């Protein structure tokens, strides 16, 4: 279901001069021994970004997942980009989260970087995030204008593809504008805020239990701390 979204995302990354980076050994691919599910992950070095990761889980009709997070270079203080798309076939349920994830919730920061996402939020009312996500505090590392829904097959094939394309374009536009203006947060603080994001996310990641059910706790714990949120690893 999400292959067209994956292709569009990777096409945009590659068009920006992305160079593949080696994924930690054993985490780039896994085949479930219990279920007919396969997970593949990619890591990219993209100009202007220190890290861009992508993960695709394919469990046939029962489950489909696409996840991606883009971490800007420390010299830029603009938001991270977060994508989470999940399809639960048995329940015919779509869960979609598309967000520019702010480093801080400061009013000036939000006014500086979120006009584009605000416009998308108004443009796609069925993805306007009015239903609060249960696993995360919307006032920390999530914006008030995220595109979020718990819908069905109709949204997965109608509004979501259009919203996804517009979301990616808007984020690229945000990045292109941000690199031309001085950051309001210094690089050392940006690095710490991105590290805090990893720690916060690793503690609350709702997909960890899902990965564990398919690939076991040992592999999934490694995947969480070594690939998804590597700055969460204790030193």
From Swiss-Prot:
Keyword Zinc: no
Catalytic activity: 15,16-dihydrobiliverdin + oxidized 2[4Fe-4S]-[ferredoxin] = biliverdin IXalpha + reduced 2[4Fe-4S]-[ferredoxin] + 2 H(+)
Keyword terms, alphabetized: Oxidoreductase
GO process annotations (BP): phytochromobilin biosynthetic process
A molecular function (GO) term: 15,16-dihydrobiliverdin:ferredoxin oxidoreductase activity
The keyword Oxidoreductase is assigned to this record: yes
Entry-linked InterPro entries: DiHydbiliverdin_OxRdtase, Ferredoxin-dep_bilin_Rdtase
A UniProt-annotated Pfam family: Fe_bilin_red
Highest taxon listed in the record's lineage: Bacteria
This enzyme's EC code(s): 1.3.7.2
Annotated function: Catalyzes the two-electron reduction of biliverdin IX-alpha at the C15 methine bridge.
PANTHER family: PHYTOCHROMOBILIN:FERREDOXIN OXIDOREDUCTASE, CHLOROPLASTIC
Family: Belongs to the HY2 family.
NCBIfam families recorded: PRK13247.1
UniProt-recorded name of the protein: 15,16-dihydrobiliverdin:ferredoxin oxidoreductase
Species assigned in the record: Synechococcus sp. (strain CC9605)
